[in-house]
Regions:
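Bacterial N-terminal signal peptides that target proteins for export
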Residues: 2-14
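C-terminal motif of bacterial Sec signal peptides marking the signal peptidase cleavage site
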Residues: 21-24
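Membrane-proximal, glycine/serine-rich, low-complexity loop/turn segments characteristic
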Residues: 26-32, 251, 261
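Start-of-domain marker
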Residues: 29-105
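Well-ordered beta-strand positions in beta-sheet-rich domains
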Residues: 75-79, 98, 116-118, 177, ...
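An acidic-aromatic
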Residues: 87-135
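Hydrophobic, well-structured mid-protein blocks that either form specific transmembrane helices
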Residues: 125-168
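Gly/Pro-enriched, hydrophobic low-complexity segments
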Residues: 154-261
Length: 261
């Protein structure tokens, strides 16, 4: 664990902080299966997707993160807490690395390197190759589309036992693709790419689970590809509780050097 934490670079810390908060929950009942209906329209599938979004106030638990950048691979378990629409907090063992994210702020510190970062979402957006804000992270957390599918028209076909949605009018800078699983109409895969910049962000939801009657992601895999790098992260969520009391202990230690990006 200490070897892992010493090896964390600024880029890895920000990437892992952003990815760790892009998902949720572990319980004993995993949701699988479902049968696609070839008669459903894109509009009907999108409507069902929004009707089935999770509704909870707080989240508290742990997530096991497996990270690989092509040159090295690491594993770490972190604590995660969330108050919906307000805050996301994570902490490595002994509080050696902590992150605190609100709708207008991204902040973290690393006690091993005596450094901290406190700023907006612009660096995370650049790192992941797409615009990122608190709402997008929260949607990723709950298996919801990271863009509002109701704002444009989509074509639909069936692919690997899921509904595949592609925009009828493809974007010039960004290309998007969504796959929705048929049992609960949650995301099976989200893909955003910038072909001109050789960037790809792909989030695949391995399965879902039921927790307090809510359907939430159980395991997630993320690929973040740029022209020069490929980062792969796998998430497994454990001991998650919903709607309990949570707090977010976070204070940047005095004397730490600010990271300027």
């Amino acid at each position: 664990m200490m070897k892992f934490l010493r090896g964390i670079t600024i880029k890895q810390t920000l990437l892992m902080a952003s990815i760790v908060i892009m998902a949720s929950c572990k319980s004993t009942k995993v949701v699988t299966g479902g049968t696609v209906d070839e008669k459903l329209s894109a509009k009907s599938v999108i409507k069902a997707h929004y009707q089935n979004q999770a509704n909870f106030k707080t989240l508290n638990g742990k997530v096991r993160v497996s990270y690989s950048d092509g040159e090295s691979s690491q594993n770490v378990s972190v604590s995660i807490r969330m108050e919906k629409d307000k805050a996301i907090w994570m902490s490595a063992p002994l509080g050696i690395v902590k992150a605190y994210i609100t709708p207008d702020r991204v902040s973290f510190y690393n006690k091993l390197q005596n450094e901290y970062f406190d700023g907006d979402f612009s660096y995370l957006s650049e790192l992941l190759g797409t615009e990122v804000d608190f709402s997008i992270l929260q949607n990723l957390l709950t298996g919801q589309a990271i863009v509002d599918l109701r704002q444009e028209k989509y074509g639909i076909d069936l692919f690997e036992e899921s509904y595949r949605l592609t925009p009828k009018l493809p974007g010039t800078l960004y290309k998007t693709l969504f796959r929705i699983e048929p049992k609960n109409y949650k995301m099976a895969l989200q893909q955003l790419s910038q072909p001109l910049k050789n960037r790809l962000l792909e989030i695949s939801y391995e399965n879902y689970q039921i927790l307090n009657k809510e359907i939430l992601p159980n395991e997630i895999k993320i690929r973040a590809i740029t022209k020069d790098n490929e980062n792969n992260i796998a998430l497994e969520f454990r001991n998650i509780e919903l709607n309990g009391a949570v707090n977010f202990p976070y204070s940047i230690p005095k004397g730490f050097k600010e990271i300027e990006l």
